[in-house]
Swiss-Prot record:
One of its GO terms (molecular function) is 2-methoxy-6-polyprenyl-1,4-benzoquinol methyltransferase activity. Pfam families: Ubie_methyltran. PANTHER family: 2-METHOXY-6-POLYPRENYL-1,4-BENZOQUINOL METHYLASE, MITOCHONDRIAL, METHYLTRANSFERASE. This is 2-methoxy-6-polyprenyl-1,4-benzoquinol methylase, mitochondrial.
Length: 310
């Protein structure tokens, strides 16, 4: 009996030690430091604070984009779509898609292609009456996106809510899905999408490397990764002006328009903490992507990085 009690006592001690180590390991993981803007915080705190930032700014997000960039963000996003060149049947994952700007442009692009093809088709047909022409357009209407689809994925439910309301208001319904999901752990199977885009979102991710690996995983072989993000200005004079504007003007705009100085102070700081164009290019390559390059827009205020899953 004494021997048995000794064995049981030893096993209980062993179990307590295992539990203690597991608890210590969990505590250590939760306390791993990262950055929230210029502040050092735990990884868990960063996730919570970033979520709160976008929860706070969701309803003023589009207005602030126009105000902060003086409307230039529209040109940057249009440029991204021109680089993408959507084709019929393309499946797009619009990560951190929030209020839908990239996906709406994607749908517009596909619709414009469809209209162009219908016009070309009708030009080659002779002696068409107006009812014939009208019927041709009506018959094509059901397949207006020609099998193309955009999945808008965002970790922030308030951003998705605002985006969905916006899509209904603007008449976008066909070919869109709205999914709550984490860029570091996507709720999709392997090899699902032709294109993965993330616009002004990846700098807010806690583990950028993990998000890049997930992007690679969900893309089909031959699929393309496209990232539009604030970057490092390569014009010395513009860089000085940009710094003054970023730190002295943007937080003020945030306070005046959105009644939220702190969120926009963080956004400015997060831009400065983001890797340079070459550093981010190397990170994309490390995730497995091939033929990685980037294009600077507005002297490097933003950059579009591109890579392929080959």
């Amino acid at each position: 009996m004494a021997h048995m009690r000794s064995v049981l006592r030893g096993r209980l001690c062993g179990m307590r030690e295992i539990l203690r180590c597991q608890k210590a390991s969990y505590t250590e993981a939760s306390r791993k430091e990262t950055h929230f803007g210029f502040q050092a915080v735990s990884e868990e705190e960063k996730r919570e604070r970033v979520y709160k930032v976008f929860e706070n700014v969701a309803h003023n997000y589009d207005i602030m984009n126009d105000a902060m960039s003086l409307g230039v963000h529209r040109f940057w996003k249009d440029w991204l779509l021109q680089l993408m060149k959507p084709t019929p049947g393309m499946q797009l994952l619009d990560m951190a898609g929030g209020t839908g700007d990239i996906s709406f442009r994607f749908i517009n692009y596909i619709r414009a292609q469809r209209e162009k093809w219908i016009r070309q088709e009708l030009k080659f047909q002779q002696d068409l009456s107006w009812p014939d022409i009208s019927k041709t357009y009506q018959n094509k209407e059901e397949g207006s996106l020609m099998g193309s689809r955009a999945v808008i994925c965002d970790i922030n439910k308030e951003m998705l809510k605002v985006g969905l309301q916006k899509s209904l208001r603007l008449g976008y319904s066909e070919g869109l899905s709205w999914v709550a999901g984490d860029a570091e752990e996507l709720p999709f199977g392997d090899d699902k999408f032709d294109v993965y885009t993330i616009a002004f979102g990846i700098r807010n991710v806690t583990h950028i490397e993990q998000a890049l690996q997930e992007a690679y995983r969900v893309l089909k072989p031959g699929g393309r990764f496209l990232c539009l993000e604030f970057s490092h200005v390569n014009n010395p004079l513009l860089s000085k002006i940009y710094d003054v504007y970023s730190f002295q003007v943007i937080p003020v705009l945030g306070e005046v328009i959105a009644k939220d100085w702190k969120s926009y102070q963080y956004l400015v700081e997060s831009i400065r903490r983001f890797p340079s164009q070459e550093e981010f290019k190397a990170m994309i390559e490390d995730a497995g992507f091939s033929k990685v390059n980037y294009h600077n827009l507005t002297s490097g205020v933003v950059a579009v990085h591109s890579g392929f899953k080959l």
